[in-house]
Design a protein with these regions (language model features):
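Nucleic-acid nuclease catalytic cores
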Residues: 221-252
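Extended alpha-helical interface modules used as scaffolds for assembling large macromolecular complexes
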Residues: 3-229
Length: 252
């Protein structure tokens, strides 16, 4: 990093490869495939784990480290979760979220084959259209899941998995935020061009709406987004524009 800093450039990879080995602890902790899937569902779909405060200190027992009920505490002491409040733990940052999503994809046998995605991202370099990236995500990524999984999914899973996919190819061009706090609420997904790149001053704000199968028929009759959803995401974009007036902010 010193060499990169002195040269005035940004490294292609900012994630320490040693961090990837942390995911092996989930394999060791959970012991079985079913337990591992349940743990990952809680983190990447529900976005949290419940825990007992006493287990962090007064009742902590290293002999329970591999007990199913003790998983949240074990992950916390491994630095793989952080405390949200006195009841819930969450993932600490986007880097760890990406690591968990990568393992989730492995467990569910979701292909990461570059052939599925690279042509779309190459076109994005040329035309800067976000819509094909979303279409590619739905067809090539979500399209690999069996139908019964979709009723378990939610907006949190959509924004996390979309972030993981987009950041694979555009992390040298953009910084990313999930549930970005602003003066009018929390935007689902935002990508902001990095200064010094061709993407500087480019900002995209995305709001996801997930509907389960029983609501799909009603939603498929719509020819355009609902008015209240458009107003919502435009307010997020306006807030970003106030903070970064030199950026070209687009909302979706």
């Amino acid at each position: 990093y010193k060499r990169q800093a002195n040269a005035g450039s940004i490294p292609d990879e900012l994630v320490d490869e040693n961090l990837r080995t942390d995911i092996n602890w989930i394999r060791r902790l959970t012991l079985s495939l079913d337990n591992a899937k349940a743990m990952l569902d809680a983190l990447v779909i529900d976005d949290e784990l419940s825990y007992n405060v006493a287990d962090l200190s007064s009742k902590f027992n290293k002999k329970k480290f591999f007990d199913k009920e003790f998983y949240p505490i074990s992950l916390f002491y491994l630095g793989m979760t952080t405390l949200k409040n006195s009841y819930r733990m969450v993932l600490p940052n986007l880097t760890m979220r990406s690591v968990y999503m990568d393992y989730y994809n492995q467990l569910n046998r979701i292909e990461g084959n570059a052939q599925r995605y690279v042509p779309t991202y190459e076109r994005y370099d040329a035309d800067r259209r976000l819509e094909p990236l979303v279409q590619n995500y739905f067809e090539q990524y979500l399209g690999q899941f069996p139908a019964q999984v979709f009723d378990k999914m939610n907006e949190n899973f959509i924004r996390c998995s979309f972030y993981e996919l987009v950041s694979r190819y555009l992390s040298s061009c953009y910084t990313f935020a999930i549930e970005q706090n602003n003066s009018v609420g929390r935007s689902d997904f935002e990508m902001t061009g990095i200064p010094g790149t061709d993407y500087y001053t480019d900002d995209r704000v995305v709001e996801f709406k997930y509907y389960r199968a029983k609501e799909a028929e009603k939603m498929l009759t719509l020819t355009e987004p609902l008015a209240e959803h458009i107003v919502q995401v435009k307010k997020y974009g306006e807030d970003t524009k106030r903070k970064f007036p030199n950026y070209h902010v687009r909302t979706y």
